[in-house]
Amino acid sequence: MHAISLLNSWLERNAVIGHRSRQSALLRVVEALLDGGKLALTQLGRARPGNAFIKHHIKAVDRLLGNSHLHNERRGIYAALCATLLARAERPIIVVDWCDCELGRELLILKAAVPIGGRAISLYEEVHPMRRYNNPRTHRQFLQRFHQMVPAHCHPIIVTDAGFRGPWFRDVEALDWDWVGRVRNSIKYFQPETQRWCDIRSLYRDATPRVRHIGLRCLSPRHRYWYRLYLVRAYQRRPGRPRKRKLYSSNDGLYRRLHRAPWLLATSLPHQRGAGALIMRAYKRRMEIEETFRDLKSHRWGFALRYAQTKNSKRLEMLLLIAVLATFILWLLGLAT
C-alpha cells in the first residue's frame, strides 16, 4: 500500500523508532486500521495483513500494544508530528480538550490538536483516570510535555472550553503562549461602576450577534484573575424552525439553555482593531476537536474506539497512537489528490 510506504519514509526520516522490527510491526497495525479494522485488539488482528493464522495476528497486535519500548518512543513520534504540522505556522490555533473513552468513564483522553479543514489532527494526547479530570497538576504536566514538542518558532493560541479555568490560563501564560477560553456558570466579576461583585450571567442580557468588548475585568473574589472579556450571542434561531418543540428527555431543556447561552470569552490577547472577530473565529474552531472525537469513537463512520475494552492506560495510548498515524497519513493522501 502506497500510504504505508509514505508513512514508513516519514518515520525513517524523523528517526523516532529505535528498531526496524518495531517500526515494521507498527506499520502493519496501521495498515490493518486503514483496511477497515477497528481500534480493538481482535479487530486489528483480523485485519492485519499476512498469511498467518488469525490467532497469531491477534497475538502480534497484543505484543505491540504492550511494548514498553514503543510506548517510550511515543512522545518522539508526537514531536515529529508537531514539527511536520506546525513547520510553517508561527501563531497556530491549538485546541485542547478532555474526552471520555466510553469505558464506564474510567479512562479519559486529554488531547491537543490543530484544526485543519474541518477536523483537528492530534498533536499530543494522554490517557488519565477519572480522578485526574480537570486536575491542575495534570494540566500543568501536560502543558510542560507538550511545550517540549512544539517548534521553538511557534507561539500558539490555546483554545479551550469552559472546563479550563484560572490555573490553566496561568500555566499557559507561563509558557509565553496566548489563550482563548469561555467563562460560564456562577462566577463573580468586579463591576467598576457599582464597585460590587456581580454574577457574570448578568452580562448576558447585553449580548448581540456582534462581538462586544467588555474590557479588562477581575474575576473570582478569592483568586482575583484579570481577564479581557468579549461577549457575543453566537446562537441564532434558524428561519422556519418551530419555536416550541417536545422535550424528549429530562436533560433536553438543560442542553437547550446551554446551547443558546451567549459566549463570554476570555483571552490573554491584547485588544486591537478586529480582535473580537478574531477571537470568536478562534473559539468556533474548538468544535473541530469534537468532530475528531466522534470520528475516533464512532463504530460506523470512524475507528470505533468504543470497541476497545482495555482498562490499561498505556495500551489505550498505543491505540490512540495508531489512530493518529492513520489519520495523519490519510490527511497527507488527501493533500496529494
Regions found by a protein language model. Name each.
Residues 18, 22-66:
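A structured, charge-rich N-terminal accessory region that forms the first stable segment of a protein
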Residues 28-32, 47-50, 80-83, 96-100, ...:
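Short secondary-structure capping/turn segments at boundaries of alpha-helices and beta-strands
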Residues 58-118:
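Active-site-proximal, Lys/Arg-enriched surface segment
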Residues 1-38, 76-77, 89-92, 103-106, ...:
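Single, function-defining residue in the core of a domain
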Residues 50-75, 236-250:
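Short N-terminal secondary-structure initiator segments
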